């Protein structure tokens, strides 16, 4: 079998102008970035707002193994399969961060014969969105430091600046730094740090904004620091929201590319799901819904993280809610949740599949709490055995959830036809009755408790002394009714990455909160979740090169 990049490089791409005609996008509606990439114009985005809204399919997964379970691959393959069976379909995905691409994951544009192309461009610099977000974020940092240097009219307490710089790389050495050293002309010395770009609040804002006006308002509402009276200092106090919006003027426009099978794809925005809300942009998803009859989108990591945030944070900003949720499962992940060591996951173990099924069952039941029909997609791997597949299908039938085997990685659109037909049948026969997990009027504390109890299966929530003090502050500042974005390990329902399966009887500890008032939510930090990852011992970058002709080598 060829590698992902070899498959991608063997495909003869069609001009993006030809691809987008399938969904009624004309040459004048796009801004070209070469022959195979484009951005959608504001004029077209506004024009289609009066169009009927199509069906929305959310793809999520069980708690993953470190290698991931193929959500992006399944999303792409499902969209291709829907087109193959005659359904006018678009896909709306996140764009990858360069940090994980160079670090542990390699490329992140699908895999095998279910990829979005040109994958090298998408994985590297694409249309420059990540750089624009990085620049806007760091421009704000520079403007804060300049404000301190020029007299500090707002009385910002330099010990309580919460805005960090960012970089779209994994670089643990930058987690904690001191800026302003050297002499008085170099600024006011203070502690600072770097997050990865996809953890920036500006990334979350870009992905939730509905237009430039909304983007500017959200940027103005960012809290960057506290003054000497411990009152919040906003971007609007610095009067720089206009400049930040200008930097992001083009980045907010969704990017258009294609799959191997020519399905039009909107790839835009990429917040992580363990430290942010983990969904592609509202603009991309909303626009796809008005251009196609079916839109397939995904939410990062397992359904306890990305899907919960999609349903509780993103959906209120969309013109519709999901008509179906597809939960991706792999036999290797189920065996891991059933107690099998990572080194033995390729060996047949039917009993481990039975034991690990508890993880899948909880995710299915969690999605049903939102009133949305669920379909299970088994992402097929070479090491899967007939006995393991049979027992998984039997277990799914026992909880009355439709299940289909999909081999889109190996067989492309054809490998997803059965799944596509089942998803369409479920959408046509079962009407979704979406409801959020919590109400707007619930306090931050109540929202956290509902997520922990109803989604994670935990017993109780423990709040640190710092978190308790912050809750009092939030009530004072009027932030106590904002949605909650949980920052938690992706490997477990709990805050302990080693507690696999479907654990119960555990508590979740909230060590602190981070207000993201521009994005419109409060981040609750659990465990040791890092906002700036480090590189592994053998980074994926060690396998990468470029030929003398300029061809990418080893990019997954």
From Swiss-Prot:
Q: Which GO terms describe its biological process?
A: tetrahydrofolate interconversion
- InterPro entries, sorted: Formate_THF_ligase, Formate_THF_ligase_CS, P-loop_NTPase
Q: Where does ATP bind?
A: 65-72
Q: Which EC number applies? A: 6.3.4.3
Entry GO MF terms: ATP binding; formate-tetrahydrofolate ligase activity
Q: Which UniProt keywords apply?
A: ATP-binding, Ligase, Nucleotide-binding, One-carbon metabolism
Q: List the disulfide bonds.
A: none
Catalytic reaction annotation: (6S)-5,6,7,8-tetrahydrofolate + formate + ATP = (6R)-10-formyltetrahydrofolate + ADP + phosphate
One Pfam entry for this protein is FTHFS
Q: What pathway does the annotation place this protein in? A: One-carbon metabolism; tetrahydrofolate interconversion
**Which HAMAP family does the entry mention?**
FTHFS (MF_01543)
Family, similarity comment: Belongs to the formate--tetrahydrofolate ligase family.
Q: Which NCBIfam families match?
A: PRK13505.1
In its UniProt entry, what is this protein called?
Answer: Formate--tetrahydrofolate ligase
């Amino acid at each position: 079998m060829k590698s992902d990049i070899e498959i991608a490089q063997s495909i003869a791409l069609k001009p993006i102008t030809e691809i987008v005609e399938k969904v009624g996008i004309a040459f004048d509606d796009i801004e070209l970035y070469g022959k195979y990439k484009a951005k959608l114009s504001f004029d077209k985005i506004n024009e289609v707002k009066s169009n009927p809204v199509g069906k929305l399919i959310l793809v999520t997964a069980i708690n993953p193994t470190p290698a991931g379970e193929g959500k992006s691959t399944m999303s792409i393959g499902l969209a291709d399969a829907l087109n193959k069976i005659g359904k006018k379909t678009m896909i709306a995905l996140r764009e990858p961060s360069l940090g994980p691409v160079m670090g542990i994951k390699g490329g992140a544009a699908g895999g095998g014969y279910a990829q979005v192309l040109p994958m090298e461009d998408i994985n590297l610099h694409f249309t420059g969105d990540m750089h624009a977000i990085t620049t806007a974020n760091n421009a704000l940092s520079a403007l804060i430091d300049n404000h301190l240097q020029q007299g500090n009219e707002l009385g910002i307490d330099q010990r309580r600046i919460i805005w960090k710089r960012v970089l779209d790389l994994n670089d643990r050495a930058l987690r904690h730094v001191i800026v302003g050293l050297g002499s008085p002309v170099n600024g006011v010395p203070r502690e600072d740090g770097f997050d990865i770009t996809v953890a920036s609040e500006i990334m979350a804002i870009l992905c939730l904004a509905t237009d430039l006006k909304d983007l500017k308002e959200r940027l103005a509402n960012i809290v960057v620091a506290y003054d000497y009276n411990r009152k919040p200092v906003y971007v609007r106090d610095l009067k720089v929201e206009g400049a930040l919006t200008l930097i992001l003027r083009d980045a907010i426009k969704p990017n258009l590319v294609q799959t191997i099978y020519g399905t039009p794809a909107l790839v835009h925005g990429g917040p992580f799901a363990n430290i942010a809300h983990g969904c592609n942009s509202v603009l991309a998803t909303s626009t796809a819904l008005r251009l196609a009859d079916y839109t397939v989108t995904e939410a990062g990591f397992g359904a306890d993280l990305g899907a919960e945030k999609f349903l509780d944070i993103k959906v209120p900003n969309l013109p519709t809610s999901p008509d179906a949720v597809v939960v991706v499962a792999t036999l290797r992940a189920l065996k891991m949740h059933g107690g099998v060591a990572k080194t033995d996951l390729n060996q047949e173990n039917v009993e481990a599949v039975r034991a690990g099924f508890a993880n899948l069952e909880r995710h299915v039941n969690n999605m049903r709490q939102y009133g949305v029909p669920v379909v299970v997609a088994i992402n097929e791997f070479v090491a899967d055995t007939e006995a393991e597949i049979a027992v998984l299908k039997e277990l799914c039938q026992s909880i009355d959830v439709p299940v289909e085997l999909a081999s889109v990685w190996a067989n492309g659109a054809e490998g997803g036809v059965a799944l596509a037909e089942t998803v369409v049948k479920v959408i046509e026969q079962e009407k979704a009755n979406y409801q959020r997990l919590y109400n707007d009027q619930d306090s931050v504390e109540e929202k956290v408790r509902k997520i922990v109890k109803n989604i994670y299966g935990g017993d109780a929530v423990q709040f640190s002394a710092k978190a308790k003090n912050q809750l009092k502050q939030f009530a004072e500042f009027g932030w106590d009714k904002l949605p909650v974005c949980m920052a938690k390990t992706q490997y477990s329902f709990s805050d302990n990455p080693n507690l696999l399966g479907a654990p119960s009887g555990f508590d979740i500890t909230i060590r602190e909160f981070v207000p993201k008032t521009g994005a419109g939510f409060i981040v609750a930090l659990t465990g040791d979740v890092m906002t700036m990852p480090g590189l592994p011992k053998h980074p994926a970058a060690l396998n990468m090169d470029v030929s003398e002709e300029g061809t990418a080598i080893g990019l997954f």
